[in-house]
Each structure stands twice: as structure tokens, then as C-alpha cells.
UniProtKB/Swiss-Prot annotation:
Source organism phylogeny: Eukaryota, Viridiplantae, Streptophyta, Embryophyta, Tracheophyta
GO MF annotations, alphabetized: 4 iron, 4 sulfur cluster binding; iron ion binding; NADH dehydrogenase (ubiquinone) activity; quinone binding
Keyword Iron-sulfur part of the UniProt annotation: yes
Location(s) in or outside the cell: Plastid, Chloroplast thylakoid membrane
Protein name in the entry: NAD(P)H-quinone oxidoreductase subunit K, chloroplastic
GO annotation, biological process: aerobic respiration; electron transport coupled proton transport; photosynthesis, light reaction
Annotated gene: ndhK
Leader sequence segment: none
Topology versus the membrane: Peripheral membrane protein
Listed PANTHER family: NADH DEHYDROGENASE, NADH DEHYDROGENASE [UBIQUINONE] IRON-SULFUR PROTEIN 7, MITOCHONDRIAL
Record's function text: NDH shuttles electrons from NAD(P)H:plastoquinone, via FMN and iron-sulfur (Fe-S) centers, to quinones in the photosynthetic chain and possibly in a chloroplast respiratory chain. The immediate electron acceptor for the enzyme in this species is believed to be plastoquinone. Couples the redox reaction to proton translocation, and thus conserves the redox energy in a proton gradient.
Amino acid sequence: MNLIEFTLLDQTTPNSVISTTSNDLSNWSRLSSLWPLLYGTSCCFIEFASLIGSRFDFDRYGLVPRSSPRQADLILTAGTVTMKMAPSLVRLYEQMAEPKYVIAMGACTITGGMFSTDSYSTVRGVDKLIPVDVYLPGCPPKPEAVIDAITKLRKKISREISEDRVMSQRENRSFTTNHKFDIRRSTHTGNYDQGLFYQSSYTSEISSKRFFKSKNSVSSHELVN
């Protein structure tokens, strides 16, 4: 405001009081300045890149893309997530500051897409790795749909309580803090060998001997069925 506006404010509303809570003030500041970490692996990310141009101008929402997860509070996953990339994605998510949010963009991120039927290395939904706040279906989604997803996330932020969200994220985890897979019931269909998915150690530490042994034990008949 300039000096004239301050003078007018004092003359017309001398007894005005703004009443709010610290939680509402925190929500308002966060929804107005979301800093996303862009995690794009395939064609869906190209649609998000269209938002940077002047036609859509996503800067008006306060979005400032960051290259470091420690400076971001929103991660936008777009594209296929493989089993080899899963620990890296979880590590990026855990390095983000609390509270943090996730938008799953595209069919490949949400369900595995066309790769989920006969691929042994595709994660069938990123929500098996990290909690998702907004699902954005499409192959690929249009830039207008991305803006709508961001708007829905802003509405969700405005109604939440920060402490409850942090506790919920810590309780509902698919991975442990040291990035090891939990033993869960298989969500994959088919009769092929899935022993490679459940490991007792880090997922990145797979010996080549074990990999090729598991790969050779799968017959073409089992893959077809």
C-alpha cells in the first residue's frame, strides 16, 4: 500500500480487526506459494512444461519449481515409475520439508498405464510408494487439467490441520525410513515369478547373478498367462 491508501484506511475503518488462527494463516501462506519438485519420466511431463509459457502462466499460483527436494513442498510425478526408480523417488519424498504434498499426473503414474499388464519392472501406482493427495488421470492430461489439479490441492490445503497431516503421513507409510521394501501382499497379476520384487536388503543392491537367474527361471508360457 502507498501513503494514500493508509490514510483512507485510517479514515474509513479505524477499528478494523483481522481475526484468524495460526493454522489458517499457515495454510493461506502455503497454498499461495507452493514450490514444486518436478519428477517427470515420460511424455506427461511435456504437458506440464507447457504451463511455463505465457498462455497458462502458472507463476500466478505462486509455483516456483525447485531443483532440490529440501526446498520443495510439492512433488509432481509424471510418467512411468519402475521398480529400480522406486527407492530414489521415496528418498526424494522423504527429503522434502513438512508438510508436503504429491500430485500423481497421468495414467502411467496412477496405475502403471499400458505397462502394467505384462511388465515385471513397473510399479502399479505411485501411491504404493508415497501418499498421493491429488490424482490427475489422462494420457497425457492437458495443461488445463494440471491447473485444475493445483486448484483442488490449494482448496485441500486451506481446510487441513498441519499437525494431523504430519501424523497421518508418518503412520501410513509403504516404505521404512532406511528405504527398504516392506513385505506386502502382491498386487500384480499373472503367474510369473515375483521373487525379485521382495528383497531383504536395499533394492539397488541386486547382484547380476541373482537377476539373470530369476529372469531365466520365467518361461514364455508363464508370461503369456
